[in-house]
Amino acid sequence: MTFVVTDNCIKCKYTDCVEVCPVDCFYEGPNFLVIHPDECIDCALCEPECPAQAIFSEDEVPEDQQEFIELNADLAEVWPNITEKKDALADAEEWDGVKDKLQYLER
């Protein structure tokens, strides 16, 4: 089992989750983070740290966000690893809670 970053992280990219991950399994794109499913140890430390509430256990990913399971796996293979907290995107608060942001994902 793994944890999955979902839609609400797009254009927010808070990195509080990165700071608590004991195995450094987060990967960073221009406006989104993903979790590498083969590196995640299912410790659940990241989930409560996400201000956007965008992280779910794989078996609890909302039905309308199932595509993010595969998206996390795919993008973790090509994006660089992130191991330290950074500032959120400048307009993160404006985007937090906006629905259906997949169209804004920058790869």
Curated annotation (Swiss-Prot):
[3Fe-4S] cluster binds at C9, C17, C50. Residues 2-30, 31-60 form the 4Fe-4S ferredoxin-type domain. InterPro entries: 4Fe4S_Fe-S-bd, 4Fe4S_Fe_S_CS, 7Fe_ferredoxin, Fd_C, FdxA, RnfB_subfamily. GO terms for molecular function: 3 iron, 4 sulfur cluster binding; 4 iron, 4 sulfur cluster binding; electron transfer activity; metal ion binding. Its cofactor is [4Fe-4S] cluster; [3Fe-4S] cluster. Binds 1 [4Fe-4S] cluster. Pfam families: DUF3470, Fer4. The keyword Amino-acid biosynthesis does not apply. PANTHER family: FERREDOXIN, OXIDOREDUCTASE. Ferredoxins are iron-sulfur proteins that transfer electrons in a wide variety of metabolic reactions. This is Ferredoxin 1. It comes from Stutzerimonas stutzeri (Pseudomonas stutzeri).
